[in-house]
From Swiss-Prot:
One of its GO terms (cellular component) is cytoplasm. This is Chaperone protein DnaJ. Participates actively in the response to hyperosmotic and heat shock by preventing the aggregation of stress-denatured proteins and by disaggregating proteins, also in an autonomous, DnaK-independent fashion. Unfolded proteins bind initially to DnaJ; upon interaction with the DnaJ-bound protein, DnaK hydrolyzes its bound ATP, resulting in the formation of a stable complex. GrpE releases ADP from DnaK; ATP binding to DnaK triggers the release of the substrate protein, thus completing the reaction cycle. Residues 42-60 have a biased composition (Basic and acidic residues). The keyword Cytoplasm applies. The gene is dnaJ.
Amino acid sequence: MSQDFYEILGVSRDASEDEIQEAYREKAREYHPDVSDDPDAEEKFKQAKKAKEVLTDEEKRQMYDQMGHERFEQAEKRGGAGGGGGRGGMGGDPFGGGAGGFDMQDIFDQFFGGGGRGGRGGSRRRQGQDLQTRLEIDLEEAYNGATKQLNVTRPEACDDCDGAGHPPGADSETCPECNGQGQTTQVQQTPMGRVQQRTTCRRCDGEGTLYDETCSTCRGNGVVQNDASLEVEIPSGIADGQTLRMEREGAPGENGGPNGDLLIEVQVRDHPDFERDGDSLQHQQAISFPQAVFGDTITVPTLDGEVEVDVPSGTQSGEVFRLEGKGMPRLRRRGHGDLYVQVQVVTPDSLNAEQKEALEQFAEAGGEEVDVDEGFFEKLKNSL
């Protein structure tokens, strides 16, 4: 048996939307798969997200409270999850998003045989679609955190008609197709019996009302494409491909419903000096042959400034040094990963006579066989 949504978020049944949102944020911080060590974190995160989506939607919450948890879950399965859309691309319209999920009124009617809430279909408050876009940042910004300006073109409610799709005071009439209900009903005879299906009225598009003129600005759509400039807070430690959510910055809702959210996929640019692996960083540092033989103190760059590293005598090319705590910050957690510095002994491409003579004497005095040293990843693994 699945858990009650109020219990999942730890709120009372009369909790306000703000209280539910705050409870969800706390659960998200605790159980987000990127930050939690709990083996069941992903499932708990999904449960909290589902609970928030239902309890912050006025219509869904009303149905949930009326039906109870188990019957609501059954009705949802029976109704299915309608809609859905692809991801937005980098060219053209940068946004994508789902159609906003299932119609709870239809599910309620199917489950109880049409005894749901009356009124026109167009009067229901619906949350707007979530929108998706991308934002590129530097590795330094991922390390330190940053405030970025994001310019987007997104659908917004038309100011001229206040999102209604028709001018104020336009003459109207009840839609004769659906008799003002916003939905039409079709009955089909199947081997299992008669099946009743309700669909949005095509003639009035679910409004239940026909108007003699449409808004010239939005052409009756109720929304227009506008440019918006948003400030995005980039948390330190964010990784390439992770998504930030800006609540209520998505597409406008219908009939006074809340806006959807804006989902921002973060893309971290490659860095010339560092390669990232989770919370760890890798850096290759060139040293000279004498430094490798006799040892030296070298200066190594980090994302937090330069540090000095002692290279012991006899260091081999490809050897890895671990600088604890010099890697990436752990997202929404304390501490940093490590920086792994792989030294590469540089072979000189030109020698003067004195250098050649010294090396020849060195070679004659040696006589030892040289083994091929283990690779970078083997050294990295063995250093852990």
